[in-house]
Every structure is written in C-alpha cells, then in structure tokens.
Amino acid sequence: MKHPFLTLATIVALGTNLTAQQQQPYPLPLEEAMHILLTNNNAIKISRNTTEIAKAQKQQLNAAWYPTIAATGGYFHFSNDISAQANMGELAQDALANLESALPGLEQILQQLLPQLEQSLSALGNITLSVPLIQQNVTTLDAAALWPLFTGGKRIFAGKIGKELHTTALHLETLVTNAQMAAMLNAYYTLKLSNDVLTMQTGNLQYISKLLDDARRLKEEGFINKGEFLVVQVACDNAVRELENARHNKKVASRALSAILGIGQEITPCGNWFILDSLPCIHSIQQEILCNNAQLKILHSQDNILHNRENIARSNYLPDIALFARGNIYSHNVPKNLLPRSTVGAAMQWTLFDGLAREKEIKKTRLEQEQVDYTISQTESDLTTAATALHSALEDAACNIQTLERTMDLARELLRERERGFAEGFCTSTEVIEARTALTKANTALNLAHWQYCTTLANLLALGSNTEKFIELHNEYRQ
C-alpha cells in the first residue's frame, strides 16, 4: 500500500504480455489474409453464385433455337356416344342423282324395272340411319414438335441479352471482390495501426513508470520538489489511460478484421508499412479508372441490354413462323378416318394490333437508356473527382511521412539530451516528460500517416478494380 499507483501501472503495463500469452494471436501475413478473404467472405461467395446463375440463364435463352418436343394425351368421357345421323330417303335421292349424272337415262330404266320405286323412296324417308363414330370413352396419346423458323430476330437479341447479363454478373463479382479487398485492407492496416500504438503506449508507460521511480527517489533525497513529482505522476496516469484506449481500439479493429475474413481467431497482422517511390500523374490514373472501373462496365452492359430490349420490341411488328408436327402414339376409340394419326405443317402468327403496347415498350426502353446514359456521365464525373481526392491524399500522406521521419529523429535527439540533463541535474522531470510526449506524438502521427497512405492507396486501386495489385506493391516497396 506504500505505492498503490505504481502497482497499478505495473499491472497495466504487463497486461498486454499476459493477454498475448493466454490468447496467442495468429500472425497473419497480408497474402494469407487476402487468400482467406477470397475463400471465406460471404459477399464474394454470393457474387460468384450470381455469376453462375447468369451463366445458366444465358444457356437457357439459347434453348429458343431448338425445337420443342412434348407428349400430350388424355382420357375423355363424353355424356353420350358421338354418331352421324341421316335420312334414308335423302340418301337414296342423292345416290340416284349421282347415278343419273354418271349414267343418263338410268332413272327411266329403274322406273320401268321397278314401278314402285317412288313409293319405296318415300317409305325410306321415314327411316333415319345412325352411324356410330366415337364411343363415350376415348383415350389418346400424341407426340408434338414445334420449331420456330422466324421470330423477327427475337432469339438473336435475347441471346445478346443473355451474354450481357453474364458479363454484368462478372463485372459485379469484380466490383464486390475489389470492395471487399479494400475493406479488408482498411481493417488489416487499422489493426496494424492499433497494434503499433498499443506497443508504443506500453513502452511509454514502462518508460514513465521508471521515470516515476526515479522522481520518487529524487524527491525523497530532496533534489526535486513535490510539484515536479506530481507532474510525473500525472503523466503516468495519462499513460495508463492511453494504454487502455489503445487496448480497446485493438479489440474493435480485431473484431472488424475477423468479421470480414470470417474467422474467429485473434489475429496479429504481419504486413509492413510501405510507400511508393513516385506516383503516376493524376491524368493517367483517371484514364485507367475510367477504363477499368467495374461499376462503369456494369452501366455500359445495362445500356446494351436496353438496346437489345428495344430491338425485341421492334421485332414484335414482324410475324412469327414455325414448323409443327404431331404423331399419334396410342389411341383408343378414335377412328383414323376421323382423326389422322400424323400431321405436319407450318403456322404463322402476326399481331396486327395490340393496343399500342409495342410503341409504349419502345418509348419506355428509350427513356431507360437515357437514364442509364445520364448515370454513366455522372459516375464518370464522380470517379474523376474521387481519383483526384485520393491522389491528393496520397501525396499529402507521403509528404507527412517524410516530414514526420525527420521530426522523429529530432524528438529522439531531444529526449536523449533531456535524459542526460535530468541525470546530471540540469533538467527537470517536466522537461523529460515533455520530450517523451513529443516523441510519442510524433511516432503516433507517423504511424497514422503510414496508415493513411496504405488505406488511401487501397481505395484508389479499388476504384480501378485493381486491388490485387496492392499485394505486388507491398512486396516490392515494404519497409
């Protein structure tokens, strides 16, 4: 109980090492993190599945070029048998008329041979002849084929739409993958920044704790007053608070990275800070982004889809022509003389008026194309502005890194001079604390500048759908 604050500071300083020994965080290189992301990330899995769906849809549209073959059949029960009825007298009169036309004079010969012919024909007029055609229960099974020959170009344009849908899905997969890569890199370097800050704050607390011991000893020996001792004690209290904040920030950053990667183990990033020797000019970066950006490619694919939809709407003005064939496989109680066993032919369907639906569809498609064109123009403008802002942020971060590296050298030299002066009695503990604080702030600012540079570079590469290049640059320029 003699020095309770010192005991608390020591426990807090050692807490990081104890926690690390218990949890044993997994050292994760940047390349492995990227591989885990591509394997485990659900958003990327969904985009890949969407691509497969679009591919299947494209193949489904190609089926319109082939004939459709189907089997149709049924069992029918009628309320009564179907039969043909006719008057015998009328049939006889018709038969005699046909014979008379074929053999002139036949009627006179028959009247001589059969004097009662007229009476017989009159008697037949009272008799009705009934011929059964189809019985009450009927069963039939047919095979039918339909092969469209001409559709006005609908199949051609539908095939183009299928290809564009597949292309759109591929661009969407690229967009999602690059967005998730950029998010992972931001989370990865945020965790690295948190680790570096935690290590720095741990060392800072250990340093100030040692300085507090020296200040207590000098106070007891009468070399410094109570005010100077309290300055060191307040600095130690602030160091404890900063260390706790650093630990909390590390936990938050670790959870964010684990969520993106889809793993539950605690991670220690092994990637390095790096900075490029030089940046390409902003014009070349903007052109590359406008050529490769996945969002722009998706919009262009949508424009092509709408153009083909308009062509399909125009093709509705033309007739549809198809070949058809039907063959009976099995039939029961269906005579051949009433229903032929096979049929082949060609059919045409031509819509002459549909309530102006075709005209409205063409107008709607044109308006949608205009909307997509406006969106493309606005997206290009937004991408150009974003590229300019990110390029400027990269230049600022690079300039800050160079300046802060010189500031770090000066802060280290200042701290060494203050420590030497404090040991010889020429400097107070307050001056040593100020020098240490300046070094800590410079180190924090340098790490923050490195974080800003790396994350900004990742976001800039993501605009051009080329985030995987970040790994190459990291391996080439890492410090």
PLM regions: where:
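Periplasmic alpha-helical coiled-coil/stalk elements that build and connect Gram-negative outer-membrane
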Residues: 28, 56-58, 171-290, 393, ...
